[in-house]
């Protein structure tokens, strides 16, 4: 879907990850500027957003997907012609980060070989939330740390690792600006291979802009 129309460049972004990890909220907040208060499982909704990076205007087609296993056979229909893939997990659900390695990276590499991947930690506002911390403690877990997220990003060969909160708006624009830049870079030959840690620790991201 690498097209250029007039002064605008078209790119396709696909977002994947476990159900209820924050994918749809992230897209809605970015494209519509509002946070949905009611959770409704996704069944492939598409959005279009205009993004300007480095003086270039990009028409970014945002393809949402459902993370539930019931949709494992339908989800691959969203992958063709993708220019960048966001793999999301939720900071308050350590299992969702584990599934990035157990499920999502294999699926993405199979259907989108060479396409840039960005790992996104959603719901970062819950990392220091007392109720979330206590609930996870009772289950013998704790919120995912930035270091754990970055480590997985390195292991799966992601172009970058970002954290955000759709609820507060923190980091949302940075995620999509990084994704847009990655989509303009073209296909990568390093997906799936470990990379050196290029994290800018203060900014919690590792895309070289």
UniProtKB/Swiss-Prot annotation:
Amino-acid positions noted as binding GTP in the UniProt annotation, renumbered to this chain: 17-24, 64-68, 122-125
Entry-annotated residues carrying N-acetylserine: 2
Gene Ontology BP terms: (1->3)-beta-D-glucan biosynthetic process; actin cytoskeleton organization; actin filament organization; ascospore wall assembly; budding cell bud growth; cellular bud neck septin ring organization; fungal-type cell wall biogenesis; positive regulation of endocytosis
Lipidation, S-geranylgeranyl cysteine type: 206
Membrane topology summary: Lipid-anchor
InterPro entries attached to this UniProt entry: P-loop_NTPase, Small_GTP-bd, Small_GTPase, Small_GTPase_Rho
Positions of post-translational Cysteine methyl ester modification: 206
Chain ranges for the short sequence motif Effector region as given in the UniProt record: 39-47
Signal peptide residues on this chain, from the entry's feature table: none
Reported effect, residue 45 to V: In RHO1-2; temperature sensitive, fails to activate PKC1
EC number(s) recorded for this UniProt protein: 3.6.5.2
Designated gene of the protein: RHO1
Any GO CC annotation of this UniProt entry: spore wall
Outcome after substituting residue 22 to A: Abolishes GTP-binding
Name of the protein in question: GTP-binding protein RHO1
Broad enzyme group: hydrolase
Record entry for activity regulation: Alternates between an inactive form bound to GDP and an active form bound to GTP. Activated by the guanine nucleotide-exchange factors (GEFs) ROM1, ROM2 and TUS1, and inactivated by GTPase-activating proteins (GAPs) BAG7, BEM2, LRG1, and SAC7, and the Rho GDP-dissociation inhibitor RDI1. The different GAPs regulate RHO1 in a target-specific manner.
Catalytic activity: GTP + H2O = GDP + phosphate + H(+)
Basic residues bias locations: 190-209
Places the protein is found: Cell membrane; Endosome membrane; Peroxisome membrane
Outcome, altering residue 42 to A: Impairs interaction with targets
Alphabetically ordered keywords of this record: Acetylation, Cell membrane, Endosome, GTP-binding, Hydrolase, Lipoprotein, Membrane, Methylation, Nucleotide-binding, Peroxisome, Prenylation
Subunit structure: Interacts with BEM4; the interaction is direct. Interacts with SEC3; the interaction is direct. Interacts with the GAP BAG7. Interacts with the GAP LRG1. Interacts with the GAP SAC7. Interacts with the GAP RDI1. Interacts with the 1,3-beta-glucan synthase component FKS1. Interacts with the protein kinase PKC1. Interacts with the G protein beta subunit STE4. Interacts with SKN7. Interacts with TUS1. Interacts with BNI1.
NCBIfam families: small_GTP
């Amino acid at each position: 879907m690498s097209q250029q129309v007039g002064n605008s460049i078209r790119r396709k972004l696909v977002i994947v990850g476990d159900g209820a990890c924050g994918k749809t909220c992230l897209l809605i907040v970015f494209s519509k500027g509002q946070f949905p208060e009611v959770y409704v499982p996704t069944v492939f909704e598409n959005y279009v957003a205009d993004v300007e990076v480095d003086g270039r205007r990009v028409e970014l087609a945002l393809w949402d997907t459902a993370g539930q296993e019931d949709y494992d056979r339908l989800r691959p229909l969203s992958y063709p012609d993708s220019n960048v893939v966001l793999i999301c997990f939720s900071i308050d659900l350590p299992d969702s980060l584990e599934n990035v390695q157990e499920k999502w990276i294999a699926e993405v590499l199979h259907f989108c070989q060479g396409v840039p991947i960005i790992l996104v930690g959603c719901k970062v506002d819950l990392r220091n939330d007392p109720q979330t911390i206590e609930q996870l403690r009772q289950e013998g877990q704790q919120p995912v740390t930035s270091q754990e997220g970055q480590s997985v990003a390195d292991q799966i060969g992601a172009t970058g690792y970002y954290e955000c909160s759709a609820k507060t708006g923190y980091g949302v624009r940075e995620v999509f600006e990084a994704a847009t830049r990655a989509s303009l870079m073209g296909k990568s030959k390093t997906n799936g291979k470990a990379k050196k840690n290029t994290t800018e620790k203060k900014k919690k991201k590792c895309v070289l802009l």
